[in-house]
């Protein structure tokens, strides 16, 4: 499957829908997004979609790795960190402090 096909797949559309719902100042893990999009074992696929995302309407900087690690951001981890800092999140090294307080989870699948 090509990158373009993956971006335009029904799963990708569900992922974009989930990520758009993450409010400023909150984050979700790749696994959280995968589960909300109906494929709980597809965290890596979500990570790949986030890495490739160039759409300004999708706040992909709000999707982080397990345990609150920043994860990649298309090679721009410093930018991801600065965007999250601007939204009020705090860090210890490359981990979000008090992930449980800022973690957003969609209760139902899309």
Language model features by range: what are they?
Residues 1-110:
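Nucleic acid-binding interface residues in structured DNA/RNA-binding domains
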């Amino acid at each position: 499957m090509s990158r373009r096909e993956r971006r335009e797949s029904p799963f990708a559309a569900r992922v974009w829908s989930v990520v758009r719902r993450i409010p400023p100042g909150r984050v979700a893990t790749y696994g959280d997004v995968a589960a909300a999009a109906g494929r709980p074992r597809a965290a890596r696929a979500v990570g790949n979609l986030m890495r490739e995302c160039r759409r300004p309407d999708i706040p992909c900087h709000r999707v982080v790795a397990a345990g609150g690690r920043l994860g990649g951001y298309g090679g721009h981890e410093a930018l991801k960190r600065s965007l999250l800092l601007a939204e009020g999140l705090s860090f210890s090294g490359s981990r979000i402090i008090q992930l449980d307080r800022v973690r957003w989870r969609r209760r139902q699948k899309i």
